[in-house]
From Swiss-Prot:
Changing S290D: Phosphomimetic, normal auxin transport activity. The modification Phosphothreonine is found at T227, T248, T286, T302, T340. Belongs to the auxin efflux carrier (TC 2.A.69.1) family. Residues 298-311 have a biased composition (Low complexity). The gene is PIN1. Changing S252D: Phosphomimetic, normal auxin transport activity. It is a multi-pass membrane protein. One of its GO terms (molecular function) is auxin efflux transmembrane transporter activity. This is Auxin efflux carrier component 1. One of its GO terms (cellular component) is basal plasma membrane. Residues 28-44, 92-100, 153-482, 528-541, 588-601 are cytoplasmic. Changing T227D: Phosphomimetic, normal auxin transport activity.
Length: 622
């Protein structure tokens, strides 16, 4: 039985971590010491330095020649079973989601072995169980955390393809990612360009959107406006590329002469707006003089879009009746992609290639449309990702002369409606991407039914994922800490070589701070959220059930399958019932995949873990 001394040993490992968490919470919530930007910097320090050095410390101290392979096989089989079931659910169920697959895998299979496992199990079953926990940590750092990175990068690539090419993804034969792009996690602004080359197939290039910033600076040097301008579109705001973060709309300098000169044949930028779609009197503010720059011109057949803030829109106009074809031509689809499925309502270049029902034309740099409402953040992040891929519909109060503008997720057969598609711009709850709703004529439809079902060929996606995972791993300190740690342990335990004291103490200083800084980061996250239970009571209860019921149950099945019996079986089950690990929360915060659920699981999991594990210990000892 566990004694009072063993209980005190467990508490000495837990209390200091809670001190760090409460200190961080008070620094933001009560004393206002840290700003959100400073909190982000602390989180980066934890992910890049504290956690990798902590992993190296434990891996290097583990003897790889004395590992209990059967115990490790049971732990690995548990994770494989859970992951397989989640993949089947994601593939076969309408409610399946890759985000939830990653989160549920973390909740049910990645416990807090360092903080609770080692001291608690040493008190229950002796020192050998502590060594088993260290071996679990080794596998977590080398295999399972790397697998999580793979899943996160796959998620980013899948979102990028489905958002940028909802109708033409199946036609893509190659995807090239510039070497300066480290990850597809959505934290850096990207732009994609699709080009039909000599082979007649679609080739995609992904690059940083630095050109947009340079274009802004060049235009500001010419004294052009850099502020949002009010539009006569209800609940919509039109920004030019040089839009600033200032959320206060100011008067537009829209120039009627420039606008109508665009309708002259052979002049101005191409567009598919007909005269019947011109702006007539509306309830919104009237247009004012504009500083619109006419820099249209011929371009190679490309289709461009951006992942965050610049040009990630496709404009589609259904064919109106005849008689609209004598007006100014279609705009460059760097911003708009006119659909040619309608009648002769628009005039376009005859040599522009058509891919997936959309006419591809290039060189769109000038005008970009961002749609927002009062429910969105008051500050418009022009270039930053919105953190979600939510969509909404807005339409003007129309009469026969007004243009109906809709924002929705495109469907392959929706050729009769005019819409603008907005990617990765949050209009609602941004932490559940699988439940984003779009409206069409007042009827709510799930975006899962409107998203493109077709993805690029498996070989194209596999190559893209492997490239991005490799780039992430070679730039991720956790990869090097795990590799160097296992290499050093193989050498040191083979020939009894000790690490030089100068290096060992340097690593020890930062590795000792790893868990404390991870808890400090958790406290910062708590303080920046309005609620301690950030995910809500129902999700918190569900996370606790996954952690303390599902995880141990699957471990029991896996342990029996590999032949674990006796004390080893008890250790395996209690290890699976430990509270949620901190490292998965750090990753979830970095990639913005349900960090509220992971933080709640860590906080309240550590509070209730001790009585739950004691209950398991008593039941297993009967």
């Amino acid at each position: 039985m566990i004694t009072a001394a063993d209980f005190y040993h467990v508490m000495t490992a837990m209390v200091p971590l809670y001190v760090a968490m409460i200190l961080a919470y008070g620094s933001v919530k009560w004393w206002k010491i840290f700003t959100p930007d400073q909190c982000s910097g602390i989180n980066r320090f934890v992910a890049l330095f504290a956690v990798p050095l902590l992993s190296f410390h434990f891996i290097a101290a583990n003897n790889p020649y004395a590992m209990n392979l059967r115990f490790l096989a049971a732990d690995s089989l548990q994770k494989v079973i859970v992951l397989s079931l989640l993949f089947l659910w994601c593939k076969l169920s309408r409610n399946g989601s890759l985000d939830w697959t990653i989160t549920l895998f973390s909740l049910s299979t990645l416990p807090n072995t360092l903080v609770m496992g080692i001291p608690l199990l040493k008190g229950m079953y002796g020192n050998f169980s502590g060594d088993l926990m260290v071996q679990i940590v080794v596998l977590q750092c080398i295999i399972w955390y790397t697998l999580m990175l793979f899943l996160f990068e796959y998620r980013g690539a899948k979102l990028l393809i489905s958002e940028q090419f909802p109708d033409t993804a199946g036609s893509i034969v190659s995807i090239h990612v510039d070497s300066d792009i480290m990850s597809l996690d959505g934290r850096q602004p990207l732009e994609t360009e699709a080009e039909i080359k000599e082979d007649g197939k679609l080739h995609v290039t992904v690059r940083r959107s630095n050109a947009s910033r340079s274009d802004i600076y060049s235009r500001r040097s010419q004294g052009l406006s850099a502020t949002p301008r009010p539009s006569n579109l209800t609940n919509a705001e039109i920004y030019s590329l040089q839009s600033s973060r200032n959320p206060t709309p100011r008067g537009s300098s829209f120039n009627h002469t420039d606008f109508y000169s665009m309708m002259a044949s052979g002049g101005g930028r191409n567009s598919n707006f007909g005269p019947g779609e011109a702006v007539f009197g509306s309830k919104g503010p009237t247009p004012r003089p504009s500083n619109y720059e006419e820099d249209g011109g011929p371009a190679k057949p490309t289709a461009a879009g951006t992942a965050a803030g610049a040009g990630r829109f496709h404009y589609q106009s259904g064919g109106s009746g005849g008689g609209g074809g004598a007006h100014y031509p279609a705009p460059n689809p760097g911003m708009f992609s006119p659909n040619t499925g309608g009648g002769g309502g628009t005039a376009a270049k005859g040599n522009a290639p058509v891919v997936g029902g959309k006419r591809q034309d290039g060189n769109g740099r000038d005008l970009h449309m961002f749609v927002w409402s009062s429910s969105a953040s008051p500050v418009s992040d022009v270039f930053g990702g919105g953190g979600g891929n939510h969509h909404a519909d807005y339409s003007t109060a129309t009469n026969d002369h007004q243009k109906d503008v809709k924002i929705s997720v495109p469907q392959g057969n929706s050729n009769d409606n005019q819409y603008v598609e907005r990617e990765e711009f949050s209009f609602g709850n941004k932490d559940d991407d699988s439940k984003v709703l779009a409206t069409d004529g007042g009827n709510n439809i799930s975006n899962k039914t409107t998203q493109a079902k077709v993805m690029p060929p498996t070989s194209v996606m596999t190559r893209l994922i492997l490239i991005m995972v490799w780039r992430k791993l070679i730039r991720n300190p956790n990869s090097y800490s795990s590799l160097f740690g296992i290499t050093w342990s193989l050498i040191s335990f083979k020939w009894n070589i000790e690490m030089p004291a100068l290096i060992a103490k340097s690593i020890s200083i930062l590795s000792d701070a790893g868990l404390g800084m991870a808890m400090f980061s958790l406290g910062l996250f708590m303080a920046l959220n309005p609620r301690i239970i950030a995910c809500g009571n129902r999700r918190a209860a569900f996370a606790a059930a996954m952690r303390f019921v599902v995880g141990p149950a699957v471990m029991l099945v896996a342990s029996y399958a590999v032949g674990l019996r006796g004390v080893l079986l008890h250790v395996a089950i209690i290890q699976a019932a430990l509270p949620q690990g901190i490292v998965p929360f750090v990753f979830a915060k970095e990639y913005n995949v349900h960090p509220d659920i992971l933080s709640t699981a860590v906080i309240f999991g550590m509070l209730i873990a001790l009585p739950i594990t004691l209950l398991y210990y008593i039941l297993l000892g009967l």
